[in-house]
């Protein structure tokens, strides 16, 4: 599993009982739902960035109705084909975790990280899907070391090619779905 980096100083974080800590003393609490907020105020462009709770719940209801199930299956098939040896996967812009959970089932040996700028989305994902590491953060400043992720999934989300390239391992896979 790759390190998760402190958004303040860039040092590796260590998971304590309910906190992520860095050697310089920066501390990030794990919420009771199971996610960590690594989005510093300096990286926010609004008071509540990302989707609202209402938007997230509406999307979850829509996705659970099965309308995008064929798309999810196709993405999982691509992940198994191109990322079958992946050890660490990031769903960048994971939303409420629908696609993250599908990828986790498709590649069960890989460590899954879900990241979204919406605290409401990450809260919902972490509350429902316990198998991943859920992070409130931004794709513009990924909290991972260079060359540490084997597969990045971006489903209808903000893409930052330079940042994705930085964190991908050599030969790593980037799967993107656009509307």
Model-derived regions: residue spans:
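N-terminal auxiliary segments of SAM/dcSAM-dependent transferases
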Residues: 1-48
